């Protein structure tokens, strides 16, 4: 499993709208692609401008197979409906490793 981890800066007064539009537009589009497993939105109660998106993919290849044109089109639709650009301030990729549990 691969984790796509994005930290964004969003105006505090627009945070709820951002989360709603992100679910309607981005999550819907991502979920239509093979390999999409789930997505979570984390908010930091101490930093009202911070939103973290945690997206789980079955494989890196499936994640990276989304056509760039589709990403650009989705970004354009999101910007048009949200009305403001959310700034990605940090992004990372993680692999989830699981090892057999040793019984004692």
What do these predicted regions represent?
Residues 24-36, 56-92:
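An amphipathic, aromatic/His-enriched active-site/gating alpha helix that lines ligand/cofactor pockets
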Residues 9-22:
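Short, surface-exposed ligand-recognition loops at beta-strand->loop->(often short) alpha-helix junctions
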Residues 2-5, 15-16, 93:
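Short acidic/polar alpha-helix capping motifs at helix-coil junctions
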Residues 1-2, 18, 34-35:
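Short, flexible segments with low predicted structural confidence
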Residues 95-104:
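Short, low-order "capping/linker" segments at domain edges
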Residues 2-9, 39-69:
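Short, well-ordered beta-strand segments in beta-rich or mixed alpha/beta enzyme
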Residues 6, 42, 89-95:
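Intrinsically disordered, low-complexity regions of eukaryotic proteins
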């Amino acid at each position: 499993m691969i984790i796509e981890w994005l930290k964004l800066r969003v105006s505090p007064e627009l945070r709820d709208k951002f989360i709603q539009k992100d679910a309607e537009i981005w999550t819907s589009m991502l979920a239509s692609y093979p390999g999409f497993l789930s997505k979570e939105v984390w908010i930091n109660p101490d930093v009202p401008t911070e939103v973290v998106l945690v997206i789980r993919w079955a494989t890196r290849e499936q994640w990276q197979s989304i056509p760039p044109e589709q990403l650009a089109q989705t970004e354009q639709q999101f910007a048009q409906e949200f009305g403001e650009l959310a700034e990605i301030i940090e992004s990372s990729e993680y692999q989830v490793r699981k090892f057999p549990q040793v019984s004692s």
